[in-house]
Structure formats: C-alpha cells, structure tokens
C-alpha cells in the first residue's frame, strides 16, 4: 500500500503593504496636563536626557530628584496654566504642531504615497508611537523633520538619538533621513521678515528697536563644539540684511537660562531691563529660533519680559508671533521637506 504524505511548504508570505514615505514633524515637547503632576512627569523626562543636561552624575541626579522635581513643577505649572489651550486641554505647542502637520499634509495631497505625522521628543505623542504608526501604515522610508531652524545637540541631535533607539528595536527598519538646520534658508529668512513687517503694521506704535531672542544654552556646550550660537548669529545677520536694519535696531539675545552655569549672552531679560532703564519706551521682540509659539514665547517673553520692560520705564511692548501654521510658515517646512525627499519621490 502506498502512503502519500502531504508536503507542507512554508506559510505564504503576507500580502505586501503598498510602499509609502513617512514625513514626521518633531518639536521639543509638552506636558500632558498643566497641573504639577503632569509638569513633573515632563520635566523628569526632559532633564534626564544627557543631551540636555550633559553631566548626569550623582550630584545632578540627587539635585533633580531631591530638589528640582519637588519645587520646579509647581512653579512651571502656574506658567503653563496662563497659556493653556483649555478648549482642547493641551498646550499651544501641541495645538500648533498638529496644525502644522495637517496643513503640510493638505499641501501635499498630490503625493498620495506621502504620510505626514507629528511627534514630540518629550511627552506625547511620542517619537516611538508615531514612528511605529508610520511603519504600520507601510512607510518603508521615513523623513524626520526636527522643527529647529538652528542645530543644537540639545535639540536636533536628541531627536536623532531617539529615532535611532526606536529603529534599533524594529525587525524591518525603514530607511531614515533627517532634515538639516535651515537657519539661513532664503524661504525662512523671507518668512521671518514678512511676519515681522506684517505684525508691526498692526501695532499702534512704532518700536524703537527689535530684540531677536533665541533659547539659550550653557556656554560650555558651545566651547565643546556645538554650532548653535554661530547659527543664531547667521540667522540674525541674514535677517538684518533682508530688513535693512543694523545691529542697533535688531539685537540678538538669549533667553530661558537654567541653573548656575554661565549661559550664552547677552541675556534677554537683562537686555530688556537695561533698554527700558536707558530710555527705550517702545519695543518688539521676535523669537526666530522657535517654529511654534510655546511656553518660552507666550509666557516668558510676552508676559514676564513685557512686565520687566514696563516695570523699568517701558511704555509699549509687543511679542511677535512665531511662524506657527501661517502660510509662510508652512511654505518653509514644505520647501525643506520637498528638498530632502529628492530621490524618494
């Protein structure tokens, strides 16, 4: 008797998912809530990143967990509450970054294989969750777009670090590209100039000068080779040239210092205080290093520094909105994305 034994071959491979290209906009991050608990969770993740605080030794860990996370969250929660989008129960940074992604996607509807998403380096939606979601949607190629015009290890590099951590755990990794800084791109400088001029046209006063305030960083980071300061200078030089302003009319300063180390100078708050004491009565401040309005622009500049200016003799103060999801702002991001997608489209 002949026995026929069925031969089972390997299971058929799953049907291929249509190949797509993912575009992921990434900004710094935000708490999930504006209460002390939410801010503490956010600050713990942010301040535990060795790209942000490079000396993560025992002294720092003791200070972070013993002092900072027990005192700073309550103070910062009050600041977040001043600017919180209560309708959506989220920070303005989250609202704006979502809008940027949606408007960028709308401008790319003729590219049906492009999938646009957004993430935060700290907080939610996390880089991990959005990269995994893009891969699940069939994105075999991924363009990560750090929304920082000027490069720094504490911003752009940590986005790359986290993206690669996520990829390291994937069996099927997408091909990855990261957009470069765009601190001197013509589209970016033109958009800044247009935004400044449009805002000034709405004011009932003419500023005597404009302060260009960038997020600060420890001077030691620059001495180790971080190009951030030189790129901030290059941005302001290009903006001065574009607007026909000299160094006395468009000043460069650095804000948001933290801790006791020396940070990049001149400091924004000290400069604004001195300008008022020296007789400047009408002032405008622009924040070219921020792609989106956030705590540092809406609270620190538009409220805290406005109060400093008025308290020391100033009379008129205006914080110029960031590019956000304006037409010019989206055009800057779109040009950057399309340039870096060459060869993939």
Curated annotation (Swiss-Prot):
Compartment(s) of residence = Cytoplasm
Recite the UniProt keywords alphabetically: Cytoplasm, Heme biosynthesis, Iron, Lyase, Metal-binding, Porphyrin biosynthesis
Any keyword Metal-binding? yes
One GO biological process from the UniProt record? Answer: heme biosynthetic process
Using the record, list the residue span of the signal peptide; answer none if the entry has no such feature: none
Which residue windows are coiled coil? Answer: none
Q: Which PROSITE patterns does the record cross-reference, listed alphabetically?
A: FERROCHELATASE
Domain of life according to the entry: Bacteria
Molecular function GO terms recorded: ferrochelatase activity; metal ion binding
Q: In which pathway does it act?
A: Porphyrin-containing compound metabolism; protoheme biosynthesis; protoheme from protoporphyrin-IX: step 1/1
Catalytic activity reported: heme b + 2 H(+) = protoporphyrin IX + Fe(2+)
The residue ranges crossing the membrane are none
Family annotation (InterPro entries): Ferrochelatase, Ferrochelatase_AS, Ferrochelatase_C, Ferrochelatase_N
Q: Does the keyword Metal-binding apply?
A: yes
Q: Which GO terms describe its cellular component?
A: cytoplasm
EC id: 4.98.1.1
The principal location of this protein is cytoplasm
Provide the residue positions that the database annotates as binding Fe cation.
215, 296
The family note in this entry says: Belongs to the ferrochelatase family.
What the protein does comes down to:
Catalyzes the ferrous insertion into protoporphyrin IX.
The name of this protein is Ferrochelatase
Query: What is the protein's species of origin?
Result: Rhodopseudomonas palustris (strain BisB5)
